[in-house]
Amino acid sequence: MTQTTVWPIDGGEVKGRTWSLASKVTNPGFALGVGFCKYFVFYDPDWDYSTYGFSSWEKDSHLVDTFLAADNPDLAQFKASDGKLILWHGWSDGPLTPLASVDYFKEVELRDPDVRDYFRLYLLPGVTHYRGGAGPDTVDWLSTMVCWVEHGEPPDRLIARKTNKNGQVTMTRPLYPYPLRAVYKGTGETSKAKNFDLRKK
């Protein structure tokens, strides 16, 4: 046992199965990982993961890290320029754990206790990798950002929606900026936002 977290959270196992389990179709997690290494890290379409020794991974991935990494918690310049940031993540995201976004927010907050003045994190229940899944995955992020940037109205309670293929809304759920969360009242349909209350974590 190495005490290393391999699969960090419960939830979304069914909807995320194609990212983590073999199937008759090409596993997207495998294709994404191997393709990323071939074309972004090593610039070698013949790169073979089965012969790679991971002891040099930090050195090998340094170049791609310089233009893809988004993990610097020092947002002082961003704040000074009056920047505003909304980060959202699906709780059922298979390839990228939402706990990474939570950890990032906490790191920023350690540097700046006033982080919520310019940075809000929303976690969408049942939503997989950027959209889809059992949960409501549609939020009007653009209007939310416009209200914050142009009218000085920071986002608070938002409504996420799930629609069917005909565009009909089949589920709504309130969202609150982390660490606040919506909790089912215990009565009424779980597909209705009105049946959820705000709870502090």
Label for each model-derived stretch:
Residues M1-K201:
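C-terminal His-loop and adjacent cap/lid subdomain of alpha/beta-hydrolase
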